[in-house]
């Protein structure tokens, strides 16, 4: 039965193709001029490329406009190796025991979530002394221990990360304005 249906489908398909190909006039779809079709009939309107063809034409035109601009300024292009070499993270060197300044962006009970500009943020406990001073948006000093807490568990072939950095909270970063105010109050 399946073979019988298949032959009927092929026969219907070939009949459709025969009708579609031989009884429709060729109009040169996708070309700007009708010269490829072999007829130069003035009554026949020019057909525009549609869908993908028109998008490809527009994209090609944009690329042609951009190419002269790119050739004129090769000095602005910097290689990845150069950007990596001059990045602040690479210039910093090993992260262990580096002093950085961060900003508290989230607080959950006594946990302070601090962003210091690294790949991950760090979580530190709120100090018991002057704990009320550590509010959201406060700038704090940190001593980095590790930029990424990772560990390889027993039998694992890859490291598992906690998506956090490890740092010790040293205190609030005093700005120049706050220091000058304290000096004026003491005098």
Curated annotation (Swiss-Prot):
Chain positions with Phosphoserine modification: 73
GO biological process: mitochondrial translation
Subcellular location: Mitochondrion
Name under which the protein is recorded: Small ribosomal subunit protein bS1m
Residue numbers bearing the N6-acetyllysine modification: 133
Protein source organism: Homo sapiens
Assigned protein family: Belongs to the bacterial ribosomal protein bS1 family.
Transit peptide per record: 1-71
Cysteine disulfide partners in this protein: none
Oligomeric form and interacting partners: Component of the mitochondrial small ribosomal subunit (mt-SSU). Mature mammalian 55S mitochondrial ribosomes consist of a small (28S) and a large (39S) subunit. The 28S small subunit contains a 12S ribosomal RNA (12S mt-rRNA) and 30 different proteins. The 39S large subunit contains a 16S rRNA (16S mt-rRNA), a copy of mitochondrial valine transfer RNA (mt-tRNA(Val)), which plays an integral structural role, and 52 different proteins.
A single cellular component GO annotation: mitochondrial small ribosomal subunit
GO molecular function, one term: RNA binding
Assigned keywords, A-Z: Acetylation, Disease variant, Mitochondrion, Phosphoprotein, Primary mitochondrial disease, Ribonucleoprotein, Ribosomal protein, Transit peptide
Pathology linked to this chain's protein: Combined oxidative phosphorylation deficiency 47: An autosomal recessive, multisystemic, mitochondrial disorder characterized by intrauterine growth retardation, swallowing difficulties with failure to thrive, hypoglycemia, dehydration, and hepatomegaly. Additional features include global developmental delay with impaired intellectual development and absent speech, microcephaly, facial dysmorphism, cataract, sensorineural deafness, skeletal features, and cryptorchidism.
InterPro entries: Ribosomal_bS1m (IPR019375)
